[in-house]
UniProtKB/Swiss-Prot annotation:
N-glycosylated. Keywords: Blood coagulation cascade activating toxin, Calcium, Disulfide bond, Glycoprotein, Hemostasis impairing toxin, Lectin, Metal-binding, Secreted, Toxin. Belongs to the snaclec family. Regulatory subunit of coagulation factor X-activating enzyme, a zinc-protease enzyme that impairs hemostasis in envenomed animal. Activates coagulation factor X (F10) in a calcium-dependent manner probably by cleaving the Arg-Ile bond at position 234. It is found in: Secreted. GO terms for cellular component: extracellular region. This is Snaclec coagulation factor X-activating enzyme light chain 2. Heterotrimer; disulfide-linked. The heterotrimer consists of 1 heavy chain (a metalloproteinase) and 2 light chains: LC1 and LC2.
């Protein structure tokens, strides 16, 4: 799934 750094929007954790 897609994840992102702190502050970003989580797509699919």
């Amino acid at each position: 799934a897609f994840c992102c750094p702190s502050g970003w929007s989580a797509y699919d954790q």
